[in-house]
Amino acid sequence: MSDGSRTALSKSTFHFAAGLGSGVLSAVLLQPIDLLKTRVQQSGAHSLSAAIADIRAAPRLLPALWRGAVPSALRTGFGSAIYFTSLNAIRQSAARISPLPSSSSSTTTSSSTTTSSSSSSLPKLSNTSNLLAGAAARSLAGLILMPLTVLKVRYESTLYNYTSLASAARDIAAHEGARGFFAGYGATAVRDAPYAGLYVLFYEQGKKRLSQLFPTTTTTTTTNSTQNGPMGLQHAASINFASGVLAGVICSVVSNPFDAVKTRIQLQPGRYRNMVSGARRMVGEEGVRALWDGLALRMSRKAVSSALAWTVYEELIRRAEAGWRAGAARERL
C-alpha cells in the first residue's frame, strides 16, 4: 500500500472515529428528550404532561429517563460515524471535481492561513453540492442503521413491553420478518435526506455569515497590511455550535411531519402501512395537528444534538488536520 493510500485510510478512519464519538456523546446526553418525543408521538392523545407523568411514576426515575439509551447511542454513534465518513468522501470528491472559484483564485495566500482564519477545515462547496452531499450521505447511513432505529423506537414506547433489546429483536423477527426491521424507512428517508441536505447547506451558510459578523481580531503584517488572525478554539466552536443550532431549528420544523408519520409506522405497522396512508389516517382521525406532535421536543433535541455532534466532530478534525500538516512539513525537511 502506498503512503498516499495509507494517509487516505488513516484520515477516513479518523473521520469515522470522530463521528462515532460525537454521535454517542450527543445521544447519551439528550436521550431523555428523545424518549419524551417518542412517547408524545406514539398516540394522538398522548400529551407531554402525560408522558412526563408516566415516567415520573416509574419505580426508578433515572433508568426510566434513559430507557433506550443503548440502542440510541449505537444508532446515533454509528450513524454519525457512517454519515460523517461518507459525507467527507463525497465532499472531497465534489471539491476536486468542481472547486469553488475562490479556492483556486487565492494564489497569494497559504493554505495554512486560509484554514486558520476559518471555523472549519472541511471542504468548501457550493450550496447545491452541500445539499446533495448531505442528502446522499444521510440516506446511506439511515439504510444501514434502520434496524437499530426500529429497535430503539419500539423499546422506548409504552406500546410494547420488551424487557431487553434481544427480546425486541426476536419478537420483530418472529412476527414481521426481516421487513419489520426496516419499517418506516421510506418516511425516514424522505424526512432525513432533505433534512440532512438542508442542514449542511444552512450550517455552512451559518458559519460563513457568523464568521463575517464576528470576525477574528486583525493583525498587522510587516507590510502594514491587515489580515484576520488565527481563529481560536473558543471562537471557532462558538460559531460552529450557533450555526448548528440555527440549522437544526429550521430543518426540524420542515421535517417534523415526516418524523411523526415515521414514528407511527414503526410503532403500529399494521395500522399505518406507509407514509402516504399513514399521513392521511393521522390527519383524518386527529387533524393536521397530529403531524406536528413532538415538534418542540424534536426541535430542541435535534438542534442541540446536531450542533453538539458537528462542533465536537469539527474540532477533532481541526486538531487532526493540524497534526497531519505538521507531520507532512516535518517529512519535507
From Swiss-Prot:
Entry keyword annotation includes Repeat: yes
Stored InterPro entries: Hem25/SLC25A38, Mitochondrial_sb/sol_carrier, Mt_carrier_dom_sf
Keywords tagged on the record: Membrane, Mitochondrion, Mitochondrion inner membrane, Repeat, Transmembrane, Transmembrane helix, Transport
Disordered: where is this region? Answer: 98-126
Q: How does it sit in the membrane?
A: Multi-pass membrane protein
Q: What does this protein do?
A: Mitochondrial glycine transporter that imports glycine into the mitochondrial matrix. Plays an important role in providing glycine for the first enzymatic step in heme biosynthesis, the condensation of glycine with succinyl-CoA to produce 5-aminolevulinate (ALA) in the mitochondrial matrix.
Where is this protein primarily located?
mitochondrion
Pfam families the UniProt entry points to: Mito_carr
The record lists its disulfide bonds as none
Question: What are the transmembrane regions?
Answer: 16-41, 68-94, 131-156, 184-207, 239-265, 294-312
Family note: Belongs to the mitochondrial carrier (TC 2.A.29) family. SLC25A38 subfamily.
Indicate where this protein resides in the cell.
Mitochondrion inner membrane
Keyword Nucleotide-binding attached? no
GO annotation terms (biological process): glycine import into mitochondrion; heme biosynthetic process
Q: Can you name this protein?
A: Mitochondrial glycine transporter
Q: Which reaction does it catalyse?
A: glycine(in) = glycine(out)
Q: Which PROSITE patterns match?
A: SOLCAR
Q: Where are the Solcar repeats?
A: 10-93, 125-209, 235-319
- Give the UniProt entry's GO cellular component terms: mitochondrial inner membrane
| Molecular function GO terms recorded | glycine transmembrane transporter activity
Q: Which domain of life is it from?
A: Eukaryota
